[in-house]
């Protein structure tokens, strides 16, 4: 028995971005350097001493100077929400400054005003892999407890400044990714190969306390704020029915969901005691940490690109391609050009798993297909991209989202990743495109930065206009 594809009337359709991947203007109007400005090869690549010309993020797609043009295109698609991040080092250039950079604050005022003009709700990530470089070099990032105070000053500043312009906030992007990418996720300067589990989990404790503190401060400044956490969402399948594979699935799942457990329940889960004991980890708590952690989030948000397989067989374990947590390849799934396995039903699964676990509203804030796009001229002489592959990917995933809603999941909204082409976080390429809008910029630095609507632009516009009824089963 089938049902009509149905989404709530208040469903927040939109798109998602990150400051470091699309703003550009990395050193304009008082902005300081972030950890991204010396990472030209992506999340897992080597860093450089200073910003280099091959770092595509320094210019990005120049949203900083073209935000009006881009927001107009988002409005044409009918966006109800637009996810963006505030570049921390645009507000506090060194991270530990006492006084914020007014020009940085003014820029986001203008962006939020422009969104408001079109009736688009901003969804703002406070920290999206953008730790100020000074905090990384001088303090070793979140490994140092001092960052809680610097983050508190930053969030208090932006919450106060934008309290009447922004309702929806996310504290950290994919906070659980710090396990695998401590530099990008937590700004930890110590090389990953030399970083102890003690220091890694202590850093994550600092982030969790800071996140809960942001929830507390935000609700004090404006009780109407809706503040969520954001995790890298990846459902885990056992590779085989062997009990050892199921135990490994449980371990991998807990490693990932530990962060959401703390955000949603306000305390550490008991299962972490064993991990800490077996790895000689002793978290240093301050006397008020437990009370601060009790400030739970209003909703759980997550990214979804792929599922994963877990196995206890060491010979089968290998670093699969993917967004940090790929695990073992699933023999039943096809993969994208970048090796990311495509699993629409996995999205339905994780929606149900997260809602069953937390019974809090959920928000899909990243989902999409990175692919090589070819710009062509259509019969009317307009430049476009015939990205039927992207349409199919998104359609198939959204059908499964509708299934999850029918299952009983409370879902606030859906924002596709990279709604306009931007620089990839994982590989730092522009060749890997996600958007409904093609940006004429290439990995050799060439291009006009002109914007062109892809075929998927009008497809998504119709999906939003019909509140999902135009989707095909």
Swiss-Prot record:
One GO-annotated biological process of the protein:
carbohydrate catabolic process
- Keywords assigned: Glycosidase, Hydrolase
Keyword Hydrolase carried by entry: yes
Question: What does it catalyze?
Answer: 6-phospho-beta-D-glucosyl-(1->4)-D-glucose + H2O = D-glucose 6-phosphate + D-glucose
Say which domain of life the source belongs to: Bacteria
List the Gene3D superfamilies hit by this protein, alphabetically.
Glycosidases
What's the top EC group for this one? Answer: hydrolase
Any one GO CC term of this protein is: cytosol
MF term (GO), any: 6-phospho-beta-glucosidase activity
InterPro entries linked to this entry: Glyco_hydro_1, Glyco_hydro_1_AS, Glyco_hydro_1_N_CS, Glycoside_hydrolase_SF
Q: Which Pfam families match?
A: Glyco_hydro_1
In short, the EC number is 3.2.1.86
Residues the record marks as active site: 174, 366
Q: Which NCBIfam families match?
A: PRK09593.1, PRK09852.1
Family of this protein: Belongs to the glycosyl hydrolase 1 family.
Q: What is this protein called?
A: 6-phospho-beta-glucosidase
For this protein's source organism, the top of the classification is:
Bacteria, Bacillati, Bacillota, Clostridia, Eubacteriales
